[in-house]
């Protein structure tokens, strides 16, 4: 049970820190109004926020549950022979529940703001494509970027948590990787690579079209993660092992 609670808390923190920074602090208009983002975090700040949540969450909770906080990560680790299949359902359940509770919290707090609105392409930091992409990217672009970036994310995770990797640096490397992933793809899909994160905020955005696009943010990240797990275990894993000495 401790593992599931840790996954719930870690995913709650990821969504609150990442999506919360996007909702509350990405854009803060200059005094007197206008469109200048004088005090807001912008894309860079939001990307750093997502990375920092994983960085801190993994250090705090990774020793309890492994610090997945993401169904795609759980699937990728399972395919890479690092995680038992019997634990997939309870882990994913805890992750999705944590994301939903965090999204509800963001929704409640956001309503207290003077400019609260669910208008726009990505209310509550939702993920989407087409009309719901921050910069209007279409379906194929969204599918490819989510697949490829989740693949890379899992390669990083599997690599830095390998038994032969330097100890103690995994949370930092994973957090920095997630930051870079957001810098690349916020304009395209608002960056998912995490089905739980996408699901939580979509449930409270008030737009059925965004819920209708959720399938892509489950399919592409999980497919990318599964391929990464397969490739790392079957192709890359032995590359880090010492070569046996010739007799």
Curated annotation (Swiss-Prot):
<comment type="similarity">
    <text>Belongs to the MIP/aquaporin (TC 1.A.8) family.</text>
</comment>
<keyword id="KW-1003">Cell membrane</keyword>
<keyword id="KW-0997">Cell inner membrane</keyword>
<feature type="transmembrane region" description="Helical">
    <location>
        <begin position="41"/>
        <end position="61"/>
    </location>
</feature>
<dbReference type="InterPro" id="IPR023271">
    <property type="entry name" value="Aquaporin-like"/>
</dbReference>
<feature type="site" description="Involved in tetramerization or stability of the tetramer">
    <location>
        <position position="19"/>
    </location>
</feature>
<keyword id="KW-0813">Transport</keyword>
<dbReference type="Pfam" id="PF00230">
    <property type="entry name" value="MIP"/>
</dbReference>
<feature type="transmembrane region" description="Helical">
    <location>
        <begin position="89"/>
        <end position="109"/>
    </location>
</feature>
<dbReference type="InterPro" id="IPR034294">
    <property type="entry name" value="Aquaporin_transptr"/>
</dbReference>
<feature type="site" description="Selectivity filter">
    <location>
        <position position="50"/>
    </location>
</feature>
<keyword id="KW-0472">Membrane</keyword>
<comment type="function">
    <text>Channel that permits osmotically driven movement of water in both directions. It is involved in the osmoregulation and in the maintenance of cell turgor during volume expansion in rapidly growing cells. It mediates rapid entry or exit of water in response to abrupt changes in osmolarity.</text>
</comment>
<feature type="site" description="Selectivity filter">
    <location>
        <position position="191"/>
    </location>
</feature>
<keyword id="KW-0677">Repeat</keyword>
<protein>
    <recommendedName>
        <fullName>Aquaporin Z</fullName>
    </recommendedName>
</protein>
<keyword id="KW-1133">Transmembrane helix</keyword>
<feature type="transmembrane region" description="Helical">
    <location>
        <begin position="168"/>
        <end position="188"/>
    </location>
</feature>
<feature type="transmembrane region" description="Helical">
    <location>
        <begin position="211"/>
        <end position="231"/>
    </location>
</feature>
<feature type="site" description="Selectivity filter">
    <location>
        <position position="197"/>
    </location>
</feature>
<feature type="transmembrane region" description="Helical">
    <location>
        <begin position="8"/>
        <end position="28"/>
    </location>
</feature>
<dbReference type="InterPro" id="IPR000425">
    <property type="entry name" value="MIP"/>
</dbReference>
<comment type="subunit">
    <text>Homotetramer.</text>
</comment>
<dbReference type="InterPro" id="IPR022357">
    <property type="entry name" value="MIP_CS"/>
</dbReference>
<feature type="short sequence motif" description="NPA 2">
    <location>
        <begin position="194"/>
        <end position="196"/>
    </location>
</feature>
<dbReference type="GO" id="GO:0005886">
    <property type="term" value="C:plasma membrane"/>
</dbReference>
<feature type="transmembrane region" description="Helical">
    <location>
        <begin position="138"/>
        <end position="158"/>
    </location>
</feature>
<dbReference type="InterPro" id="IPR023743">
    <property type="entry name" value="Aquaporin_Z"/>
</dbReference>
<feature type="site" description="Selectivity filter">
    <location>
        <position position="182"/>
    </location>
</feature>
<dbReference type="GO" id="GO:0015250">
    <property type="term" value="F:water channel activity"/>
</dbReference>
<keyword id="KW-0812">Transmembrane</keyword>
<feature type="short sequence motif" description="NPA 1">
    <location>
        <begin position="70"/>
        <end position="72"/>
    </location>
</feature>
């Amino acid at each position: 049970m401790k593992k599931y609670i840790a996954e719930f808390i870690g995913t709650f923190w990821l969504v609150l820190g990442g999506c919360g920074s996007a909702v509350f602090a990405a854009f803060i208009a200059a005094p007197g109004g206008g469109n200048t983002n004088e005090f807001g975090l912008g894309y860079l700040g939001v990307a750093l926020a997502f990375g920092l949540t994983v960085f801190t969450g993994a250090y705090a909770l990774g020793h309890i549950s492994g610090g997945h906080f993401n169904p795609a990560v759980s699937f990728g680790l399972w395919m890479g022979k690092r995680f038992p299949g019997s634990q997939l359902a309870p882990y994913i359940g805890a992750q999705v529940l944590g994301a939903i509770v965090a999204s509800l919290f963001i929704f409640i707090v956001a309503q207290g703001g003077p400019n609260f609105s669910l208008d726009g392409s990505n209310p509550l930091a939702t993920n989407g494509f087409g009309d719901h992409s921050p910069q209007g990217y279409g379906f194929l672009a969204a599918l490819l970027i989510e697949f490829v970036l989740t693949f890379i994310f899992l390669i990083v995770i599997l690599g830095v948590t390998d038994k032969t990797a330097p100890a103690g640096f995994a949370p930092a490397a994973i957090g920095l990787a997630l930051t870079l992933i957001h810098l690349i793809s916020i304009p395209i899909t608002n960056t998912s690579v995490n089905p739980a994160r996408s699901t939580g905020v979509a449930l409270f955005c008030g737009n059925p079209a965004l819920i209708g696009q959720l399938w892509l943010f489950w399919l592409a990240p999980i497919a990318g993660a599964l391929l990464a797990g397969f490739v790392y275990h079957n192709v890359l894993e032995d590359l880090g092992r010492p070569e046996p000495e010739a007799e």
